[in-house]
Each structure stands twice: as C-alpha cells, then as structure tokens.
C-alpha cells in the first residue's frame, strides 16, 4: 500500500491530446521525471508519466490511457515513484497491459511483489565474460545462425510466413528442454494478433510458462513506448531472483521507436533525421542494455523488426541493427515450397558463427552447407532455361545434395502437431552438425529427396527412406 503521507497533489492545467500539464502550486515537492501520477475520471483511473518540468510549478506528462473526459482543475495524485508492475510466479500464464493490470478477465494479482519499469542494466562485473550458445533445438538456427545466451536476435518476416509458429516453438523448447520461461511484449500489436497468439499458446500447452504484455495499436503512444519496459521488468525478476533463463519476445521493436517519435513530437522536441526523435539512440540503448546475461541467469531477446519501405538505412532499423547478435530472415519463397521453418539460410547471419566460438567442426559444416546452397541458387537460372541435364556432373551432384539439404532444413514443430499430424522433434546441436556433415560427405546421396522432409536427425531420414521403399514395393 502507498502511504498517504508520501502522496502529493496537483491540478490539471492543460490537455493537448495525450499530453497533460499538471500544476503543483500548493505543493513544495514536484514530481521527478518518470514519476507516476493518476487522475480519477468518472468511470476509470487515468495514469500519467512525468516527462519534463516547465517553469517552477508545472510538470508536463504523457498519458498512458485515453484523455477523453479530462478537464482543467481536476485533482491529480503524484505517487512519488515510477510505474511499478507485478513480478514473480503469479504473472505466469497471464496477460497484462503497460501498467501491469491483468486484461485476461481472471482473478486480480497480489499487491506484492512489484518493481519499477525504469531500472539500471546489470553491472559490468555481474555479467559473464564467456559466450554461451543458446541451443534452440531447431536445426537451421543452431547450425547456421546460432543464438547467444543473453543475446539479441532480429526476426525479419512478413505476414503468413510462420513467424508466430516459430515464436511458439522457441517458447515451447525453452520451457520443455531448458526449464526456462518466456515473456512476450506486443508493442503496437493489432488486437486480433494478440488474441490469436493467446489462444494458440493455450492450445500449444505453453501458456503456463509464458507472460504476455500488450500495448495495442489503438492505445496512446505513451503506453506503446513503455510496454516493452514492462515486459522487460518482469523478465528481469525471473533472471535476477529466480536465476532463470528467460526468452523475451518483442513484436515489433519498430513500433517502440515509432511511439517514441510520436511522444517526442508531442513534447515539442526538434525532430532528427527522417523525422525521428533526437533521443532515438539513447532510448534504444537503454532498452537493449538491460537485455543481458548475469552469472546466475539470462535474458535472450528475439525482436521482430519491421523495415519501413524495405530501407535498411532508415534510422529506426539501423539503430536496432547495432545491438543485434544474430539475424533470422523468414522467406516467403521458402514457405511457398512447403518448407517450415521458412528461414532463409543465406540471408540469416550470426556473429557466433566463428570457429573460436562454435568450434572448427561446426564452422566447417555450416560453411559447407552455405556454399552448396549458394551454388544451387546460382544454378537456378541455368536449370530453368536449359534443364538439369545440361549441367556438369559436379554441378549435378551439388544440385542433388542442395535439394536434400534444403529439405532437411525443414523440421516438424511440437506446437504444429495438431494441424500437421507429424510429431515434433527437438534436435540437439551435436546431432544437427553430425547429420549435415554426413549429407555433405555424400553418405546419403542414394536416399530419395522426400526422405529428408520433416524429420529430426539423419537416422530418421534413413528410416523414412526404408518406409518409402517398402510402400513403393507394395504398389508394384
């Protein structure tokens, strides 16, 4: 409970859309920047966040909810602390807004524990000086774009290419294989997408290990700008107090920047390049620096990134890129082939794909896979015009192996079992590297290409080939 003596009071002085000026003419103590204030409306309570001081007694605030019905001289309460949100095991399986209020219609949460959404990143001496690979159990990711524990991954993909299913599978694997937790931040999300995700997680059986936090597209920019911090605060508690490995999803990180730009314009700040806020790099840095590992736990972040007009030099995505450790690109052309996850193995990259980190064996296999797929892509035009028979014997072998590799990069997901009818597979990193190594060495050139579709390890592909041969023999 907040003690009454800690509260101070002011009055609404001016309302300009989501910007509210509050005057504290009778109070000696003014709110500090980031302090939380509230106004009691007829049917609800409106929360504000102090952003700057104007003159001797006026505080300019950003509303975290709709300001309709707000009038001058209405009483404003200053809580003398930043926004605090619930944390701990009680938040698992629940859905929240930016203020940490449940929006899933279930029972209210206990009043404690709570934490401020404005926190410092882990101290340098608390962070480990080693680089650990975060094993996802998804072959194409672990082999070609390995994730770093406590790192930041950019997820690029349009609608309908399997982004949500990939996110759900990552949540499933960290929960089942690593006993970890996941926090999902919907920043500027469409309400429909958030609703679909919630029910899909219930059906996929991963909701009990997940927290959902939404600042929807129809909400004021103040709410959309702070919702990522709300989710991050919940993830930090699991990392610091429960020593957990946490997966943090932010969809979409561009909306975080966009909301900051709107707030900056409303506050009258001079715009910077392409109309973005002058504080873009600082705001992004404050968020990204808090996503880190400590010696007892970690937060690994997967951030969906929208690129305006496909311009990678736009300040919003360009500022995000500087913080990323890996880039995962979902490709519609690969999805059209029926290969899921539809990750482009040539456009996706990771700074961890280095022999000093992953080991020389893993590095050589990954490089070999990329080289064959690159050569296969170069030969596509020749095959389309002249046909495969016009290729040299060496190129024919490359094409056949590339097709097997391309098919083998597909994988049945646990969360997709209900509509695919294929049991999900978690493939260890060692099995992944060994399987692709055998394909590169030509040990399985005699197997049909169909045997490599939607299997886990290479042993499963061999067994599937035997079944296919038996079925073929029966049809004779």
UniProtKB/Swiss-Prot annotation:
Topology class, membrane: Peripheral membrane protein
Class in the EC hierarchy, top level: translocase
SMART domains: AAA
Keywords: ATP synthesis, ATP-binding, Cell membrane, CF(1), Hydrogen ion transport, Ion transport, Membrane, Nucleotide-binding, Translocase, Transport
EC number from the UniProt entry: 7.1.2.2
Catalytic activity annotation: ATP + H2O + 4 H(+)(in) = ADP + phosphate + 5 H(+)(out)
HAMAP family per record: ATP_synth_beta_bact
Similarity comment text for this entry: Belongs to the ATPase alpha/beta chains family.
Oligomeric form and interacting partners: F-type ATPases have 2 components, CF(1) - the catalytic core - and CF(0) - the membrane proton channel. CF(1) has five subunits: alpha(3), beta(3), gamma(1), delta(1), epsilon(1). CF(0) has three main subunits: a(1), b(2) and c(9-12). The alpha and beta chains form an alternating ring which encloses part of the gamma chain. CF(1) is attached to CF(0) by a central stalk formed by the gamma and epsilon chains, while a peripheral stalk is formed by the delta and b chains.
Name of protein: ATP synthase subunit beta
UniProt organism field: Mycoplasma genitalium (strain ATCC 33530 / DSM 19775 / NCTC 10195 / G37) (Mycoplasmoides genitalium)
């Amino acid at each position: 409970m907040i003690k009454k003596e800690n509260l101070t009071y002011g009055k609404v002085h001016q309302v300009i859309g989501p910007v509210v000026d509050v005057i504290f003419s009778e109070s000696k103590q003014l709110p500090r920047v980031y302090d939380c204030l509230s106004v009691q409306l007829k049917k609800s309570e409106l929360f504000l966040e102090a952003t700057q001081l104007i003159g001797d007694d006026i505080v300019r605030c950003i509303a975290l909810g709709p300001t309709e019905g707000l009038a001058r001289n209405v009483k404003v309460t200053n809580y003398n602390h930043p926004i605090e949100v619930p944390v701990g095991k009680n938040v698992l399986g629940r859905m929240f807004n930016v203020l940490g209020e449940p929006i899933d219609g279930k029972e209210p949460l206990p009043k404690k524990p709570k934490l401020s959404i404005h926190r410092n990143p882990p101290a340098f001496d608390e962070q480990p000086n080693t680089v650990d690979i975060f094993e996802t159990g998804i072959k194409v990711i672990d082999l070609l774009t390995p994730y770093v524990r406590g790192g930041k991954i950019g997820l690029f993909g349009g609608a309908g290419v399997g982004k949500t299913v990939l996110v759900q599978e990552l949540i499933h694997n960290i929960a089942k294989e690593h006993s970890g937790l996941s926090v999902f931040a919907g920043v500027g999300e469409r309400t429909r997408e958030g609703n679909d995700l919630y029910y899909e997680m219930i059906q996929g059986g991963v909701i009990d290990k997940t927290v959902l936090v939404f600042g929807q597209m129809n909400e004021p920019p103040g709410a959309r700008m702070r919702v990522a911090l709300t989710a991050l605060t919940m993830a930090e508690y699991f990392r610091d107090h429960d020593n957990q490995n946490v997966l943090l999803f932010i969809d979409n990180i561009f909306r975080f920047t966009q909301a900051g730009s709107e707030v900056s314009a409303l506050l009258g700040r001079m715009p910077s390049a392409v109309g973005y806020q002058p504080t873009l790099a600082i705001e992004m840095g404050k968020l990204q620096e808090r996503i880190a590992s400590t010696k007892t736990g970690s937060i690994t972040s997967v951030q969906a990134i929208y690129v305006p007009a496909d311009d990678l030099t736009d300040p919003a995505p360009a500022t995000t890129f500087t913080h990323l450790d890996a880039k995962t690109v979902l490709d519609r052309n690969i999805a059209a082939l029926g290969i899921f996850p539809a990750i482009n193995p040539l456009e996706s990259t990771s700074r961890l794909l280095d022999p000093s980190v992953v080991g020389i064996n893993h590095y050589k296999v990954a490089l070999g896979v990329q080289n064959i797929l690159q050569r296969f892509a170069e030969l596509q035009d020749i095959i389309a015009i002249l046909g495969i028979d016009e290729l040299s014997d060496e190129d024919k072998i490359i094409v056949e192996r590339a097709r097997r590799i391309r098919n083998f990069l597909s994988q049945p997901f646990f969360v997709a079992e209900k509509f695919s009818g294929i049991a999900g597979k978690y493939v260890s990193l060692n099995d992944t590297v060994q399987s692709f190594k055998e394909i590169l060495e030509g040990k399985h050139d005699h197997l049909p290409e169909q045997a490599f579709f939607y299997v886990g390890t290479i042993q499963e592909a061999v067994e599937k080939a035997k079944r296919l041969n038996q079925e073929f023999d029966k049809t004779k």
